[in-house]
Amino acid sequence: MCNLLVAEQCCRICELRNGWYTENYTESVPTTLANNAFYGSVENGKISSALRAELAEAAADYAVALVQVGLGEGFAGLIAQWDMDTSNGALTCCLKRVWYLVIKNLHLS
């Protein structure tokens, strides 16, 4: 539904999504070795992981990337801050609120 609302506004969509932290897989090592299988992967065992430091480096440029796809600087900074807060364990807003602000911002543009 949200993708349809954004598409109706004829804007470009940029989705930035993290894989899992590499250290999240370490607790699976004993089970993987015991069963000769890695549970949780798809197809040919491909996974998406990165070190926390790598994801932190990418997050530093997140607000800049949001501005480059057309969001205002203030709004991009707000979304980047929400994402940083959420990644640090604090849920600062719900998804409905974010999409409300995205749609509102599109109407103001």
UniProtKB/Swiss-Prot annotation:
InterPro entries: NmrA-type_oxidoreductase
Family designation: To E.coli YtfG C-terminal region.
Name this polypeptide is given: Uncharacterized protein HI_0742
The organism of origin for this protein: Haemophilus influenzae (strain ATCC 51907 / DSM 11121 / KW20 / Rd)
Taxonomic classification: Bacteria, Pseudomonadati, Pseudomonadota, Gammaproteobacteria, Pasteurellales
